[in-house]
From Swiss-Prot:
Single GO molecular function: phosphorelay sensor kinase activity
UniProt keyword Cell membrane present: no
Cellular location(s): Cytoplasm
Reactions catalysed according to its record: ATP + protein L-histidine = ADP + protein N-phospho-L-histidine
Ranges where the HPt domain occurs: 1-102
Protein name per UniProt: Chemotaxis protein CheA
Enzyme's top EC category: transferase
Transmembrane segments: none
The CheW-like domain, residue ranges: 490-618
UniProt keyword annotations, A-Z: ATP-binding, Chemotaxis, Cytoplasm, Kinase, Nucleotide-binding, Phosphoprotein, Transferase, Two-component regulatory system
Length: 618
């Protein structure tokens, strides 16, 4: 087994698992939808063939048992019930675990005996010993030359054949047939338990069909089916002028490009020092080309948020059943694209927030009825672009956040005083939820309520340069809003100097730079404040924030006015070096205690390492 074959198997398996979960969720709401049943059967059947070909026998055994049950449903001998759907969902959970094991070098081993027994229990005894064997047929259909609506006759044939089995291939493809882009004949590959004569009779029963030839395919076709499908998909991708590239290759290319940005910065420094105008002119043109390359690379790394969102419908269903609640998850904007690196970071925070909405937000059926609500709660998961950011909102129509309860807990924990609590805004009250160990849950549940969720969520979001806020109304629901950057690799920044160091400030956070008189700074309740454009803002000495020597100019101070999600404030600095396009490098394990104050570091053209401020933490 080659690495490429294994990678292809894992990729295809993941796609079929997602299709199984998505279609099962739809089938639960529409249990008489035969098309959904056929789609689910087709996914299980293909999964079985792939697994058997690759030698993952337990995966093949489980999908075969699923296929037997789904075949009974498909042939109207078994009804779709909540119990049946639950068992199939248990199968998909097993398969997810088994595929993960294969991905990490295992053979997909798992204890599936109980689940297989549950599947077999759904079947009638006589059906267990008298299951029909499906065969693969190649069917050539010729329509009369005088027929006026050939496409209509062809589609009728396809619909009749779909009722007898699974259509795995048509020549030409389905779209071409529907557009009548064929002469008189077309071919269909059908997997069916019917005989050749039965299939032929059904097609000839359609008017204006001149000739039908049904040929049974040899067994070899099924053995190489996964390879055929892979080749077919590859051909389709080539037709669409798209290819799949491993993320590692894109990352390597991005790293090389980032090094070129650093080298360009070094050449910029040389050009400025030598005042070489010709070199500066060429650098300007190179910058334009470099920008195009950068945009192309970043676009290659963009993936839809659906790659994270698609795990949540099944999760919400499972959790709702455990808690005895009825919950609908509505997803919007799943095709919104964001950097793959950002996607990898937001998965766990979103899990925390959605579990929180299920556990604390959505009420039980009885409580919702009592409050005059629909007994089914709704959680909306929405994503959309906003400038250079992506906004993700998790909103529920549940109980909302009890502000009085939040304040009482905060007072009891000495987070705020009772006097301070009377002056707090709603935003300030809700912000208390993100303090470490803070929870308003009366009881600790298996899902949440241990006070270890929301602080972790905020810290993770802050580390990637994002921000999170909450809006809530009692008995109307809550909305958690996350705003994250589209990409974390290359950012526009303002380089500033303090008394001892240089720092990079994201340009998106900078409002303006002004000079102020030190005498204008007022000291109130331990804070330095100044009147800025008819608004009182806090002033911080940036160097002093990191234990540097404070600036003691008596005449005037340089103030960089910046904004974050919560407020506008000023940073006292020594000098502004200028705007730079910088490459963001992660800090790894360095600065562990204060790492949250920095989103990363960069290397300047002169070789200096500069820390990048995360202003959301100020």
């Amino acid at each position: 087994m080659t690495t490429n074959m294994l990678d292809l198997f894992i990729e295809e398996a993941s796609e079929h698992l997602q299709a199984l979960n998505d279609n099962l969720l739809q089938l639960e709401k529409d249990p008489t939808n035969g098309q959904l049943v056929s789609e689910i059967f087709r996914s299980a059947h293909t999964f079985k063939g792939m697994s058997a070909t690759m030698g993952f026998q337990q995966v093949a055994d489980l999908t075969h048992a699923m296929e037997n049950v789904l075949d009974e449903v498909r042939n109207n001998r078994l009804a779709v019930t909540e119990h049946l759907v639950d068992i199939i969902f248990t199968c998909t959970s097993h398969l997810e675990t088994m595929v993960s094991d294969i991905q990490h070098g295992g053979q997909g081993a798992a204890d599936i005996s109980k689940t297989v027994a549950d599947l077999e229990a759904l079947l009638h005894p006589e059906q267990e010993t008298d299951l029909t064997v499906e065969k693969t047929y190649r069917i050539a259909i010729q329509i009369e030359e005088a027929a006026i609506l050939k496409a209509v006759r062809a589609v009728m044939c396809l619909e009749r054949l779909a009722e007898m089995g699974i259509i795995s291939e048509t020549t030409p493809d389905r779209e071409a047939i529907e557009l009548e882009e064929f002469e008189q004949s077309f071919e269909v590959v059908l997997e069916s338990a019917q005989t050749k004569d039965e299939i032929k009779a059904v097609i000839l029963d359609i008017s204006e069909i001149e000739k039908v030839t049904v040929t049974e395919e040899v067994e070899e076709v099924q053995v190489i089916e996964p390879i055929k499908k892979a080749a077919k998909q590859t051909t389709k991708r080539l037709e669409n002028k798209t290819i799949r590239v491993q993320l590692e290759k894109i990352e390597k290319l991005m790293n090389v490009f980032e090094e070129s940005v650093i080298e360009r910065a070094r050449i910029d420094e040389i050009a400025e020092k030598t005042n070489n105008k010709e070199l500066m002119e060429h650098l300007g043109r190179f910058s334009s080309i470099s920008k195009e390359i950068q945009n192309g690379l970043l676009n290659m790394r963009m993936v839809p948020v659906d790659s994270v969102f698609n795990r949540f419908p099944k999760m919400v269903r499972t959790l709702a059943k455990e808690l005895g609640k009825k919950i609908d998850l509505v997803i919007e904007g799943a095709d919104t694209e964001v950097d793959k690196i950002v996607i990898d970071e937001i998965g766990d925070p979103l899990v925390h927030l959605i579990r929180n909405s299920v556990d604390h937000g959505a009420e039980t059926v009885e409580v919702r009825r009592k409050n005059g609500k629909n007994e089914t709660a709704t959680i909306n998961l929405k994503a959309f672009h906003s400038g250079n950011n992506v906004v993700i909102e998790i909103a529920d129509d549940g109980a909302g956040i009890n502000k009085r309860k939040v304040l009482e807990k905060a007072i009891a924990k000495n987070v705020v005083t009772r006097a301070e609590s009377t002056k707090m805004t709603d935003a300030e009250i809700f912000d208390l939820l993100f303090d470490s160990g803070f929870s308003t849950a009366d009881q600790v549940s298996d899902l949440s309520g241990r006070g270890v969720g929301l602080d972790v969520v905020r810290n993770t979001i802050l580390k990637i340069g994002g921000k999170i806020s909450v809006e809530s109304s009692e008995n109307a629901g809550s909305t958690f809003r996350i705003e994250i950057p589209l990409t974390l690799s290359i950012i526009q920044s303002m380089l500033v100097a303090t008394s001892e160091r240089r720092y990079a400030v994201p340009l998106a956070n900078v409002a303006e730079a002004i000079t102020i008189n030190p005498a204008d700074i007022q000291h109130v309740h331990g804070k330095d404040l100044i009147n800025y454009r008819e608004t009182i803002i806090e002033v911080l000495d940036l160097g002093e924030c990191f234990h540097e020597t404070p600036l003691n100019d008596t005449d005037e101070l340089l103030l960089l006015v910046v904004k974050n999600a919560k407020r506008t404030f000023g940073l006292i600095i020594k000098d502004i070096i200028g705007q730079r396009e910088i490459v963001l490098k992660t800090l790894g394990g360095f600065f562990s205690e204060s790492q949250i104050a920095f989103s990363g570091a960069t290397i300047l053209g002169d070789g200096r390492v500069v820390l990048i401020l995360n202003l959301e933490t100020f």
